[in-house]
Design a protein with these regions (language model features):
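Phox homology (PX) phosphoinositide-binding domain
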Residues: 2-4, 31, 48, 58-61, ...
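Short N-terminal "domain-start" leader segments
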Residues: 1-28
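Detector for methionine-enriched segments
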Residues: 1, 9-10, 54-57, 75
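A short, exposed loop/beta-hairpin motif centered on an aromatic-Gly-Thr core
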Residues: 35-53, 57-59
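Short, mixed-charge low-complexity intrinsically disordered segments
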Residues: 61-79
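A short, structured beta-strand/loop element
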Residues: 19-44
Length: 79
């Protein structure tokens, strides 16, 4: 596992026809060794608390960045 990978959430204001503007959260894997984002999933959720819980869990269990999208999909299916 790579202890230097940190999962972060990034808020972004988006627009969708029929909905209007809304805030959603992207989740990214930041590699401290490379000083760069190595994986990102856009527009994961509009629920800030859920995005925080996801990042906390990914950091706690040191999720590999290659599994980020799959882990997010699995967590969203469980809601």
């Amino acid at each position: 596992m790579n202890d230097l990978t940190q999962y972060i959430m990034m808020p972004k204001i988006r627009y969708a026809p029929g909905i209007g503007t809304y805030v959603s959260y992207d989740i990214a894997a930041y590699d401290g060794f490379k000083s760069d984002i190595v994986s990102i999933v856009w527009d994961v959720t509009s629920d800030r608390d859920l995005a925080i819980r996801m990042c906390e869990m990914f950091n706690r269990y040191q999720l590999s960045p290659i599994h980020l999208e799959e882990a997010i999909i699995d967590m969203l299916k469980c809601l």
